[in-house]
Design a protein with these regions (language model features):
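N-terminal cysteine/histidine-rich coordination modules
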Residues: 1-81
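Core catalytic machinery and nucleic-acid-binding channels of phosphodiester-processing enzymes
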Residues: 21-23, 90, 154
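Cysteine-rich micro-motifs
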Residues: 38-52, 70, 86-99, 117-119
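Amphipathic alpha-helical packing elements
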Residues: 118-162, 169-178
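A composition-biased, non-transmembrane "mature-region" signal
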Residues: 8-16, 60, 79-88, 95-98, ...
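C-terminal, charged low-complexity interaction regions
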Residues: 165-199
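Conserved small-residue-rich
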Residues: 67-94, 98, 135-143
């Protein structure tokens, strides 16, 4: 079988792919790039040239508090969808009626409004498209190319340099709608559309 139709899993994890990201700019919705910068990250828009450093989270997150009331020591628990930089929740004790703001633990989510986001700013990924109830996505163009090679291969092999446990590898965790041979042509067409995406 020709190498064109074979794919040997290089042992890549999703974490290995999280080196940079292509996202929608929070200012103009154009294409923006998130790259490592001075031991942190920087987002730069290719359309409006907006530049931003980490600080604001644009995606979904949950604020969660589980504490004992400061007055009567009754257990208090609350969880709400949060936005921006929330870090406190106002709570009223059902037992003694005391009201107070408590420090909340913030849990950031990788999905916002049904679409995937980057793990740095929570911005919607540029390279994604809904497929039925699912979403096909990639962090950046190199990630998209690897997915294209995998989808296009008729023979998919576990590579010899495979360094991780089988279930931690990116290709072993792909959803069925991507891995199913019957969806190959549809997926390749979708990947080509994403490669050509301008707006």
């Amino acid at each position: 079988m020709s190498d064109k139709y074979r794919f040997a899993d290089p042992g890549t994890t999703l974490h290995d792919m999280a080196t940079h990201f292509v996202v929608h700019c929070p200012k103009c919705d154009g294409k923006a790039l998130i790259n490592p910068f001075e031991e942190s990250w920087r987002q730069t828009c290719t359309s409006c040239f907006h530049v931003e450093r980490p600080g604001q989270w644009y995606g979904s997150m949950t604020a969660y508090v589980s504490v004992k009331c400061r007055e009567c020591r009754h257990q208090l628990t609350r969880s709400v969808e949060a936005g921006g930089q929330w870090n406190k929740l106002k709570m009223k004790c059902d037992n003694c009626g005391d009201e107070c703001e408590y420090e909340a633990h913030l849990s950031k989510h990788s999905i916002h409004n049904g679409l995937m986001t980057d793990p740095v700013f929570g911005l919607t990924l540029w390279l994604q498209k809904p497929v039925g109830d699912d979403v096909f996505w990639a962090y950046h163009y190199e990630h998209l190319t690897l997915l294209e090679q995998y989808v296009g291969a008729k023979l998919r092999e576990r590579g010899v340099d495979n360094k991780g446990s089988k279930n931690s590898l990116m290709f072993s965790r792909l959803p069925t709608f991507i891995t199913k041979a019957g969806n190959r042509e549809e997926m390749l067409k979708l990947i080509h559309e994403l490669q050509m995406k301008i707006k």
